[in-house]
């Protein structure tokens, strides 16, 4: 059935405008993104079908271009559109993070790092550079590796920190396996980085490991 034949209050776009985005199901939200259906399926039916094939919105968002474009109703234009939406969302979170003290909003910091790193297919090492008020100067992926490791060079972290005139750092990396527990290598490199930065009076405030739905804080565990 065409969405135009549905009562106005049941159409996803109109429902969002009158009741807000929270009132919509995943399929209805995805239908607004899709805008149109395909032969034999309206936008909501196509969205429901795609969610069943991918398993979740998260899996759809994390799909690479090749996998994404294999599905009917999706293609390079939709993939580019989705990546733009994801990037805008991440930049919004980063802007919000920069507006405050990361130590007074630890949950927001966790949420930002989770959104940024959780679904990466390769291990990446990310650094938040902070000023003397613990406000974010910048955040950067400094190293990217394979599915289970990333080579990290403390000298490069020190160099970049001095370039930003940072006073403190928050380190983070993901475990694509989904398990957020640190390895012995994680513990060693964190101590090496912390010691190297201490020589130039820069503190490591925390190191987060991002897994599948969980984040482990070195500071909270007493490892820093």
From Swiss-Prot:
Entry keyword Hydrolase: yes
Binding site for Zn(2+): 173, 175, 186
CDD domains linked: MPN_DUF2466
Keywords, in A-Z order: Hydrolase, Metal-binding, Metalloprotease, Protease, Zinc
Cross-referenced InterPro entries: MPN, RadC_JAB, RuvA_2-like, UPF0758, UPF0758_CS, UPF0758_N
Sequence ranges assigned to domain MPN in this UniProt record: 102-224
GO biological process: proteolysis
NCBIfam families: PRK00024.1 (NF000642), radc (TIGR00608)
Name this protein carries in UniProt: UPF0758 protein PBPRA0202
